[in-house]
A protein has these predicted regions:
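HotDog/MaoC-like acyl-thioester-processing domains
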Residues: 1, 79-123
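Catalytic strand-loop segment that frames the active site of acyl-thioester-processing enzymes
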Residues: 1-43
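Hydrophobic beta-strand-centered segment that forms part of the acyl-chain substrate-binding groove
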Residues: 36-39, 49-86, 116
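Intrinsically disordered, low-complexity segments enriched in polar/charged residues with Gly/Pro
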Residues: 12, 19-20, 63-64, 91-93
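Catalytic-loop motifs flanking and including active-site residues across diverse enzymes
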Residues: 44-48
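Hydrophobic residues in beta-strands and at strand termini
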Residues: 8, 73, 121-123
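Glycine-rich loops and low-complexity Gly/Arg-rich segments
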Residues: 27-33, 66-68, 95-98, 113-115
């Protein structure tokens, strides 16, 4: 599977918050995020998972071919002001009886942000 890089910045966080209705201030207000012990504003977990899901769907030839997809959040994606963060996604596909098992990796600055990320697709 070919690696893909997704760009995450504060503007994307704002657009995602507006689209999803998740206006939790840890995703937009730096002072609030720091007041609750975070290093800075963080990306929505479901945004991160959604971007990795897009990687899976694109590789599978469409979302209808994705039979299962799961992951665990292991580290927040910190998005400092005036910065673009690279979410690097790649994976290994193994074919079994016409289905592909994908073992996925999602990292920021070399650190894993999703754990146990996997999918089952028909291609």
């Amino acid at each position: 599977m070919q690696e893909r890089i997704f760009k995450i910045d504060r503007e994307l966080l704002k657009r995602y918050a507006d689209a999803s209705g998740d206006q939790n201030p840890i995703h937009q207000d730096e002072a609030f995020a720091k007041s609750v012990g975070l290093p800075d504003v963080i990306a929505h977990g479901m945004l991160t998972m959604g971007l990795v899901g897009q990687f899976v769907s694109d590789w599978a030839g469409g979302s209808a071919n994705v039979k299962e997809y799961s992951a665990r959040f292991v580290k927040p994606v910190v998005v400092p002001a005036n910065t673009v963060v690279d979410l690097v996604v790649n994976g290994v596909a193994t074919e079994e009886n016409g289905l592909y098992r994908l073992e996925l990796t999602a990292t920021v600055d070399g650190l894993k942000v999703l754990g146990m990320a996997k999918a089952l697709v028909k291609k």
